[in-house]
Amino acid sequence: MRKIETQMQNALRNRVNWSSGNTTVFNDNEGNQFVTLHGNLIAQISNFGDIKLSSCGWETNTTKSRLNAILDTFLNGISVFQKDFVWYIGDDEFFDGYTIHR
């Protein structure tokens, strides 16, 4: 895992606003958390724990790595991966807006 992703995970766990390079974590007044990559909203974590993910149309290794670091922060054993140029999450085909209800 990249250093920036470890720092991002710490910000998410500690519920603090943080920014470094192309990645930003911010929180709203209702306890929701948001992660952006290059200004694109790639993850929303609700105050109830639901996780909504998006590549924002950028299915790159960096986007996938950030999404997996976010998933690793809150869940065990689930990840975004690529097979034959198609992204998957668990057994499902990944799509922008994919939501994990917890």
What do the predicted segments below correspond to?
Residues 1-102:
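Terminal leader/tail segments of proteins
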